[in-house]
């Protein structure tokens, strides 16, 4: 189908400075991975989030893989995860053999509910994964972390969609024990389509990450000769954890450092557009948006709403059909509840008591919201949605 306003796989346009940063690495960097540009990016990102240790990786899923390793989750343990999130929030913990337990979401924020978490905690609960979905920090994240600490449970923040959001002056990913960030091609900033960062509070755990991230390799210390016994050491003490190769390239790292410099301005632009969009529908009860108590806590990665059909007697799917076929606006649906996935069903995780998540998913709409969309296309989308909603009323 040919759309006038389509769902884009590209979140931003690179500046000449950003392009030149990549070209410079292509021409001059030696090595092309695990070099000075990675160190600079990790340092810049650490400064941005307040000083916690940070490590660049290939993507946020691999950041969560490393976190799953470091939490030592295993068969017999339980990991609580919201049922409404992208599958990558859960798969790394599923690999461990632990039991995945699905938590419900709050009906107003569409984010994981503390009450649901409390109802699911058992003596076997080892980790709670919270997801700051659509760009919004969970409003009561501090309460969730406090509760988890009282139960000796680790908190992992999936910040893949929320970079740029802050709550009480704290950046997402710094409330819990671990944080994972994404620079995928559709995220608010992207390092050539893929990329990620892991952050954590525990300094002792942080020392293990370079080895786990890169096949156990680390420079020999106090060597008499640089070649004895070999150029790199795979005997680094990582306490029995099998290492991976999740290395971020030098080109991606150099680009990431430059992109961080305009993250705040990009976030401001997204907030302004999101505000305009939401205000355009104050007289349209058919669309229920996330409840936002603190604007700075939202980086507006995505623009989502719950379709309420009481006004028109129509369904979400009828709305999407009209919007796409007549007005050529490509709105989509996200994210399939994880307990409904065939993968998780086959693994024994097909049960959940998540009525809010089910209701939201069955009626949710995600509108195109890439920053490269022209103002005229953005206005056209708003006008088309209004017209479609009125048309559905009959």
Question: For each predicted feature, which ranges?
Answer:
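Active-site region of PLP-dependent enzymes
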Residues: 162-168, 175-302
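Active-site phosphate-binding strand-loop segment of PLP-dependent enzymes
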Residues: 108-191, 197-199, 203-207, 366
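Active-site-adjacent capping/gating segments
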Residues: 162, 169-170, 174-176, 233-240, ...
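Conserved PLP-anchoring active-site segment centered on the Schiff-base-forming lysine
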Residues: 65-122, 127, 323
